[in-house]
Amino acid sequence: MMEASASWDICDVGAPGILNGMKNYDIQMLGLCDNEYNTALFVRPDSPQAADPTNPEVWKGIECILPTGTTLQYMFLSYLQSLGLSADDVTITNMDVTPALTAFNAGEGDALCVWNAVAYNAEDSGLVRITDVSELGINNVCGLAATKDAMENKSDLIDLAWMVYYLTWDWCQQSEDNMAQAVELYVESC
Protein backbone atom coordinates (compact mmCIF):
# COMPACT_ATOMS: atom_id res chain seq x y z
CA MET A 1 0.00 0.00 0.00
CA MET A 2 2.76 2.45 0.87
CA GLU A 3 4.40 1.77 -2.49
CA ALA A 4 1.31 3.35 -4.08
CA SER A 5 1.24 6.41 -1.80
CA ALA A 6 1.52 8.72 -4.81
CA SER A 7 -2.03 7.67 -5.75
CA TRP A 8 -3.73 8.44 -2.41
CA ASP A 9 -3.80 11.22 0.19
CA ILE A 10 -5.11 9.55 3.36
CA CYS A 11 -5.44 5.93 4.42
CA ASP A 12 -6.40 3.58 7.24
CA VAL A 13 -3.61 1.06 7.68
CA GLY A 14 -2.29 -1.42 10.20
CA ALA A 15 0.64 -0.69 12.48
CA PRO A 16 3.24 -2.38 10.23
CA GLY A 17 2.08 -0.25 7.30
CA ILE A 18 2.28 2.92 9.38
CA LEU A 19 5.83 2.11 10.45
CA ASN A 20 6.85 1.25 6.89
CA GLY A 21 5.27 4.44 5.57
CA MET A 22 6.89 6.68 8.16
CA LYS A 23 10.31 5.08 7.69
CA ASN A 24 10.42 4.66 3.92
CA TYR A 25 7.76 6.84 2.26
CA ASP A 26 7.57 10.10 4.25
CA ILE A 27 4.04 9.27 5.45
CA GLN A 28 2.70 11.07 8.51
CA MET A 29 0.54 9.33 11.11
CA LEU A 30 -2.56 11.30 12.06
CA GLY A 31 -3.75 9.08 14.89
CA LEU A 32 -5.06 5.70 15.93
CA CYS A 33 -8.29 4.70 14.27
CA ASP A 34 -9.27 1.28 15.59
CA ASN A 35 -8.21 -2.00 17.09
CA GLU A 36 -9.21 -4.56 14.48
CA TYR A 37 -10.74 -7.27 16.61
CA ASN A 38 -12.19 -8.89 13.50
CA THR A 39 -8.78 -10.03 12.28
CA ALA A 40 -9.22 -13.78 12.07
CA LEU A 41 -7.88 -17.15 10.97
CA PHE A 42 -10.27 -19.39 9.01
CA VAL A 43 -10.23 -22.96 7.70
CA ARG A 44 -12.67 -25.15 5.81
CA PRO A 45 -15.23 -27.01 7.96
CA ASP A 46 -14.05 -30.44 6.79
CA SER A 47 -10.35 -29.78 7.49
CA PRO A 48 -8.17 -31.42 10.15
CA GLN A 49 -7.58 -27.93 11.58
CA ALA A 50 -11.32 -27.41 12.12
CA ALA A 51 -11.62 -30.82 13.79
CA ASP A 52 -8.64 -30.34 16.13
CA PRO A 53 -7.54 -26.67 16.04
CA THR A 54 -5.16 -26.81 19.01
CA ASN A 55 -3.21 -29.84 17.76
CA PRO A 56 0.12 -28.54 16.41
CA GLU A 57 0.56 -31.60 14.19
CA VAL A 58 -2.41 -30.69 11.97
CA TRP A 59 -0.88 -27.27 11.28
CA LYS A 60 2.56 -28.49 10.19
CA GLY A 61 3.08 -28.15 6.45
CA ILE A 62 -0.15 -26.27 5.72
CA GLU A 63 -0.40 -23.34 3.31
CA CYS A 64 -1.95 -20.17 4.75
CA ILE A 65 -3.06 -17.36 2.44
CA LEU A 66 -2.67 -13.83 3.83
CA PRO A 67 -1.10 -10.48 2.96
CA THR A 68 2.43 -10.67 4.32
CA GLY A 69 3.96 -7.88 6.36
CA THR A 70 0.57 -7.02 7.85
CA THR A 71 -1.29 -7.40 11.11
CA LEU A 72 -2.74 -10.61 9.67
CA GLN A 73 0.70 -12.17 9.51
CA TYR A 74 1.34 -11.01 13.09
CA MET A 75 -1.92 -12.62 14.23
CA PHE A 76 -1.24 -15.89 12.37
CA LEU A 77 2.30 -16.17 13.71
CA SER A 78 0.99 -15.46 17.22
CA TYR A 79 -1.43 -18.36 16.86
CA LEU A 80 1.31 -20.66 15.59
CA GLN A 81 3.50 -19.60 18.51
CA SER A 82 0.69 -20.48 20.94
CA LEU A 83 0.88 -24.01 19.48
CA GLY A 84 4.67 -24.15 19.75
CA LEU A 85 5.12 -23.64 16.00
CA SER A 86 6.70 -20.96 13.83
CA ALA A 87 6.62 -19.68 10.25
CA ASP A 88 9.18 -22.36 9.40
CA ASP A 89 6.51 -25.02 10.01
CA VAL A 90 4.07 -23.68 7.37
CA THR A 91 3.96 -22.08 3.94
CA ILE A 92 2.64 -18.52 3.82
CA THR A 93 1.30 -17.33 0.46
CA ASN A 94 1.13 -13.56 0.02
CA MET A 95 -2.23 -12.32 -1.31
CA ASP A 96 -4.56 -9.39 -0.57
CA VAL A 97 -7.60 -10.32 1.53
CA THR A 98 -10.42 -10.12 -1.03
CA PRO A 99 -8.69 -12.22 -3.72
CA ALA A 100 -7.42 -14.48 -0.93
CA LEU A 101 -10.99 -15.31 0.08
CA THR A 102 -11.89 -15.99 -3.55
CA ALA A 103 -8.84 -18.23 -4.00
CA PHE A 104 -9.52 -20.06 -0.74
CA ASN A 105 -13.15 -20.67 -1.69
CA ALA A 106 -11.87 -22.06 -5.01
CA GLY A 107 -9.76 -24.62 -3.15
CA GLU A 108 -6.40 -22.88 -2.78
CA GLY A 109 -4.53 -23.13 0.52
CA ASP A 110 -5.39 -24.80 3.81
CA ALA A 111 -5.96 -21.72 5.97
CA LEU A 112 -6.90 -18.09 5.39
CA CYS A 113 -6.35 -14.90 7.37
CA VAL A 114 -8.64 -11.93 6.66
CA TRP A 115 -9.90 -8.82 8.44
CA ASN A 116 -12.92 -6.58 8.77
CA ALA A 117 -15.86 -7.17 6.44
CA VAL A 118 -13.99 -9.87 4.53
CA ALA A 119 -14.05 -11.90 7.76
CA TYR A 120 -17.85 -11.62 7.71
CA ASN A 121 -17.79 -12.84 4.10
CA ALA A 122 -15.64 -15.79 5.18
CA GLU A 123 -18.18 -16.74 7.84
CA ASP A 124 -21.06 -16.26 5.40
CA SER A 125 -19.37 -18.68 2.99
CA GLY A 126 -19.28 -21.35 5.71
CA LEU A 127 -15.65 -21.14 6.79
CA VAL A 128 -14.72 -21.92 10.41
CA ARG A 129 -13.15 -19.19 12.53
CA ILE A 130 -10.25 -20.77 14.43
CA THR A 131 -9.10 -17.68 16.31
CA ASP A 132 -8.86 -13.91 16.14
CA VAL A 133 -6.88 -11.12 17.76
CA SER A 134 -9.40 -10.72 20.56
CA GLU A 135 -9.19 -14.41 21.49
CA LEU A 136 -5.40 -14.31 21.28
CA GLY A 137 -5.32 -11.22 23.50
CA ILE A 138 -3.03 -9.31 21.14
CA ASN A 139 -3.11 -5.71 20.01
CA ASN A 140 -3.93 -5.03 16.39
CA VAL A 141 -3.93 -1.27 16.26
CA CYS A 142 -4.47 0.60 13.03
CA GLY A 143 -3.86 4.22 12.25
CA LEU A 144 -4.84 6.97 9.89
CA ALA A 145 -1.97 8.27 7.82
CA ALA A 146 -1.51 10.91 5.15
CA THR A 147 1.12 11.78 2.62
CA LYS A 148 3.36 14.76 3.30
CA ASP A 149 2.07 16.41 0.12
CA ALA A 150 -1.55 16.05 1.24
CA MET A 151 -0.77 17.42 4.70
CA GLU A 152 0.92 20.46 3.16
CA ASN A 153 -1.40 21.12 0.21
CA LYS A 154 -4.77 19.58 1.11
CA SER A 155 -4.97 20.04 4.87
CA ASP A 156 -8.66 21.06 4.81
CA LEU A 157 -9.56 17.86 2.95
CA ILE A 158 -7.42 15.75 5.28
CA ASP A 159 -9.17 17.34 8.29
CA LEU A 160 -12.56 16.62 6.72
CA ALA A 161 -11.66 13.01 5.92
CA TRP A 162 -10.39 12.54 9.48
CA MET A 163 -13.64 13.91 10.95
CA VAL A 164 -15.85 11.84 8.62
CA TYR A 165 -13.90 8.70 9.52
CA TYR A 166 -14.35 9.16 13.26
CA LEU A 167 -17.97 10.33 13.03
CA THR A 168 -18.77 7.28 10.89
CA TRP A 169 -17.08 4.97 13.39
CA ASP A 170 -19.03 6.61 16.22
CA TRP A 171 -22.26 6.03 14.26
CA CYS A 172 -21.29 2.37 13.70
CA GLN A 173 -20.86 1.88 17.44
CA GLN A 174 -24.27 3.34 18.31
CA SER A 175 -26.22 0.19 17.41
CA GLU A 176 -25.97 -3.28 15.94
CA ASP A 177 -28.22 -2.16 13.07
CA ASN A 178 -25.83 0.67 12.21
CA MET A 179 -22.88 -1.72 12.27
CA ALA A 180 -24.72 -4.23 10.07
CA GLN A 181 -25.54 -1.49 7.58
CA ALA A 182 -21.92 -0.31 7.58
CA VAL A 183 -20.68 -3.85 6.94
CA GLU A 184 -23.14 -4.23 4.07
CA LEU A 185 -22.04 -0.93 2.51
CA TYR A 186 -18.38 -1.88 2.93
CA VAL A 187 -18.85 -5.26 1.29
CA GLU A 188 -20.76 -3.70 -1.62
CA SER A 189 -18.10 -1.08 -2.27
CA CYS A 190 -14.86 -3.01 -1.68
Question: Each predicted region: which residue ranges?
Answer:
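Short polybasic/polar patches that bind polyanions
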Residues: 81, 123, 187-188
